[in-house]
Amino acid sequence: EQAPHFGILYQDTKPLLKGEDGYNYLYRINCGGDDFTDSFGQLWMQDNTNYSRSWAASFNELNPYLASQRTTNDPIRGSRDWKLFQYFRFGRHQLEYNFPVADGMYRIEFYFTEPWHGTGGSASADCEGLRIFDVAVNDSVVLDDLDIWAESGHDGACKKVVYAIVKGGLLKIHFPEVKAGQAL
């Protein structure tokens, strides 16, 4: 049974996660979460140390996966697939993902939400500038000074698409400049 007016939470959903026609998706990672099948039937693989590494890798007593993982139970505006957006990773400039791929041009889709700033705030809360970071692919910045809150507010789904050329068989995603903490 659902709470009264629960359906209002789905009013402004968009098909953000639907795979783009004409593309073969090699990796879908649920950053900070377990395997997840979205409303389009697409599998998002568990985030683990097969592809990612964080600051915690420098400490033998810490699990490098769990050390930079968090979750929220808040509903996510703009998507029916809340669970995918409710898990996230952080790790400043030491968080990175490495994917073996054939050399060539790749379309990379990033999905973000602001999980903390604005929690419990009124509609007039302004959290712009409290989380700013760069996203790089193979050492080239593709998203400069990304401010998730400025893009979609608190608990709003945000999608960014970039293109990158891979040489050497490895697609590396990292965060070379973190001015105020990232959340993926």
Regions found by a protein language model. Give the residues of each.
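Compositionally biased, intrinsically disordered or flexible polar/acidic segments
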Residues: 1-184
